[in-house]
């Protein structure tokens, strides 16, 4: 909620910038998640704060761009293509938080193919003359593919709570780095 754009565009008191009654303009904000993923303690809090502002003005949210940056220290920053699960699970956690806590109805990645950086889902290797080369996939590509495959347009979220064996609510279990993050989905046909 940097710069109060939600309020500026959708609060009727913002006389110079209000768009809320403009025909054919959806009540929707798009945002990039750069520099909002670390430290982990702020990942959820920042998205909850965003959701609060969105709900206050009845505005939807699309997360319109994410890629690995230098501050993503948990996975070594953005340099060096990573074909392993480390980056894939890191990004899956970001997607989870954007959908669950910020209420993102759409989620986009930065780019599909790249060089020796973590922002490409596929690593390209080209010859010096740029006329030949090869490509290599990453686990990140498959993690994003699973979100695309199993969360379809029109899907809705259901609120679920986790409890321990004694029946006590487990607060914030999904932000525990050592804990298990679990999502379950039901298809339209009930399966």
Question: PLM features: residue spans?
Answer:
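Short intrinsically disordered, low-complexity coil segments enriched in acidic
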Residues: 1-10, 151-152, 182, 189-191
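Noncatalytic carbohydrate-binding groove/subsite architecture in carbohydrate-active enzymes
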Residues: 1-94, 101
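Generic detector of bulky aromatic hydrophobic side chains
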Residues: 24-25, 142, 191
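Carbohydrate-binding surface patches
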Residues: 165-191
């Amino acid at each position: 909620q940097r710069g109060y754009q939600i309020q500026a565009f959708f609060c009727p008191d913002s006389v110079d910038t209000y768009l809320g009654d403009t025909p054919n303009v959806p009540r929707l904000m798009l945002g990039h998640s750069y520099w909002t993923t670390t430290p982990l303690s702020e990942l959820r809090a920042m998205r909850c704060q965003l959701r609060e502002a969105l709900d206050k003005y009845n505005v939807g949210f699309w997360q319109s761009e994410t890629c690995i940056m230098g501050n993503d220290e948990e996975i070594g920053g953005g340099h060096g293509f990573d074909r392993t699960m480390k980056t894939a699970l890191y990004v899956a956690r970001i997607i989870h938080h954007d959908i669950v806590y910020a209420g993102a109805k759409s989620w986009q990645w930065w780019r599909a193919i790249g060089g020796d950086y973590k922002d490409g889902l596929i690593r390209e290797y080209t010859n010096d003359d740029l006329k030949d080369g090869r490509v290599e996939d990453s686990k990140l590509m498959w993690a994003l593919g699973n979100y695309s495959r199993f969360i379809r347009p029109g899907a809705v979220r259901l609120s679920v709570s986790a409890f321990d064996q004694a029946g006590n609510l487990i607060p914030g279990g999904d932000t525990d780095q050592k804990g298990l993050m679990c999502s379950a989905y039901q298809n339209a046909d009930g399966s």
